[in-house]
């Protein structure tokens, strides 16, 4: 196994920890929770719809008629969203989580914990194919692998933030938030290692692009169903909206800078 692609994939995955460290700089608060949820939601939506979707349409457009290409990509995106929604329903509800924070419960902390769990699980699913993609890109062309790792690291940072802030708020422990962010990124090097050991023949370009679209569906669902609603907290609506706007704009700049 070549060392360089694994190193690139590991660094890209661990960049979620940088998002966790950024979250640890400020004490957890409802305002920070709203702003970070909006920021991460903006990044995830923009990365999915302005970066991953056009790439998938361009790839499958080389093999399928336009209508069939669009139908295939939309179907995969929808399947990813449905998968994320189903997994979200399997997690504990806020009432069950609130009971763990004392006899009286704490709805705000319970909601934050559920957001952290849903987002973290979705990112594990999303990061696995990203790790495979980075690994194979680095194996085929080190320069392409470096650009791919840089692009993935760029949106992994706010993803780590999206996990760390609610986790730190729920647990009242910033270190726990950083660790949660790091764990969510470990799926990338894990995906690379498993791909190399067991799945090399399975990961054709068509299959890999399909898994990326599925992962994009997961991100879209998390952004629309979990992060952006959390950003629109009645008391901190402005912070959430500004966070979402900044996330969208920064991700667009990143896409332009790292094609």
Model-identified regions with their sequence ranges:
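Intrinsically disordered, metal-sensing/regulatory segments
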Residues: 1-259
